[in-house]
Design a protein with these regions (language model features):
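Cell-envelope/extracellular polymer assembly enzymes that use nucleotide-activated donors
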Residues: 20-23, 52, 203
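Short aromatic/hydrophobic "clamp" motif used to bind/position activated sugar donors
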Residues: 104
């Protein structure tokens, strides 16, 4: 797939030859509520080329497997493969190996994409010659708390200035949401590193760029994301994201940057200031005020920034925004400081891939409910969970 001349912003993306066949791939576990909608929106894509869907299914406690098999039985474009470990990066690699085509489109089991998503992404991939093209994660909430999370996740005060969160002009980017890949580029870097239970997208895009490839952000490629619905779930998500972002930094020290070190530094300042305030309470008001300065400044800053960013939210969401922002910061920073107990040694791409043989369903000769992994079987419980 050779690069085409890059179009100007004024002209837009030029007309291209017949679109190539694509494989849309996803990995799921315990997704019975959303899987049918996720697959059907892919099958309904307004795409002129050939399209198939590969679903890697992990050990589930619900009807995810049965629903996937029913979808495959109804439409020959859908194939189901087994992901014995249930881990996201392993499932993605299994789906990629099972794919028949050279353009690979990743979606999530609970994401929502527009009918033109695949066509627009493939056109951009061809026009730019990039290894990976992705767009904007658009969080959409329905409750006041979810609306506050959505606003925090799409603003720089909540999650930083990454273009796939906050938007921006089309162009090269460090990473993008999900992704539409050239298969040859993925194979050259050996796909997803299966050590990284989370942050595997960022880590993969880093290796692509290190290999001289281009990761391209296109704001037209919007993907709807449903945010966490309560403080506990949000804190758990961001704590684990912080853990795994530190793991990426340990494995790739060159990726260290101020953006990733600010939240843990803030946590240290808040906790240290609070501890000194307790001690200072016995030493007199001067020590107490000095020790409380950092935590107080942080609280004032979060409240002030939230008032600006959330000024057009409905009141119930607006009053929750400072709590949401603080939860994101403190949980992510704490996770980063905690890290992952198990150190990454060799990359998974250097290790033999055990238990990753693609098993296609339905297959009357080999498939039976008894032969499939039980829920949780094959998972490495020494690593933090993904959610």
């Amino acid at each position: 797939m050779s690069p085409s001349p890059r179009p100007s912003d004024a002209d837009g993306y030029r007309s291209l030859p017949a679109l190539p066949p694509v494989t849309v791939f996803l990995t799921v576990r315990d997704e019975e509520r959303h899987l049918t909608a996720a697959v059907e929106q892919v099958l309904a894509q307004d795409y002129a080329g050939e399209l198939e869907v590969v679903v890697a299914v992990g050990p589930s406690r619900d009807r995810t497997r049965e629903i996937a098999d029913e979808l495959a039985a109804r439409d020959a474009r859908v194939r189901v493969v087994d992901n014995p470990t249930g881990r996201t990066p392993a499932g993605l690699n299994i789906a990629i190996r099972a794919a028949r085509h050279d353009v690979l489109v990743r979606v999530d089991g609970h994401s929502e994409i527009d009918a033109s998503y695949v066509a627009a992404a493939v056109e951009t991939l061809l026009a730019t010659g990039a290894a990976n093209v992705g767009g904007l994660m658009v969080p959409v909430g329905t409750t006041p708390f979810e609306e506050a999370v959505a606003r925090a996740m799409s603003s720089s005060i909540g999650i930083g200035s990454a273009s796939f969160h906050t938007g921006g002009a089309a162009g090269p980017a460090p990473t993008v949401y999900l992704g539409v890949f050239r298969r040859d580029a993925l194979e050259r870097v050996d796909g997803y590193d299966e050590h990284f239970v989370r942050a595997q997208d960022w880590e993969l895009n880093h290796r692509l760029r290190e290999a001289g490839e281009v990761v391209w952000f296109d704001p037209r490629l919007a993907v709807t994301y449903r945010p966490r619905g309560d403080v506990r779930a949000l804190a758990r998500q961001f704590f684990r994201s912080g853990q795994w972002r530190r793991q990426v930094m340990r494995h790739h020290p060159e990726t260290a940057g101020l953006r990733y070190l600010t939240p843990p530094a803030a946590v240290v300042g808040i906790v240290g200031g609070a501890a000194l305030a307790v001690v200072g309470a016995t030493a007199g008001p001067t020590w107490l005020v000095a020790a409380a300065a950092v935590p107080a400044a942080y609280v004032v800053g979060v409240v002030a920034a939230s008032a600006v960013v959330g000024r057009d939210l409905r009141p119930a969401a607006r009053v929750r925004l400072p709590l949401v922002v603080a939860t994101m910061h403190v949980a992510w920073g704490s996770g980063f400081l905690r890290g992952v107990a198990r150190k990454v040694g060799r990359s998974a791409r250097d290790l033999p891939r055990q238990g990753h043989t693609a098993v296609l369903y339905p297959d009357p000769a080999t498939s039976s409910p008894d032969a499939r992994p039980a829920p949780g079987e094959g998972r490495d419980h020494r690593l933090p969970a993904e959610d």
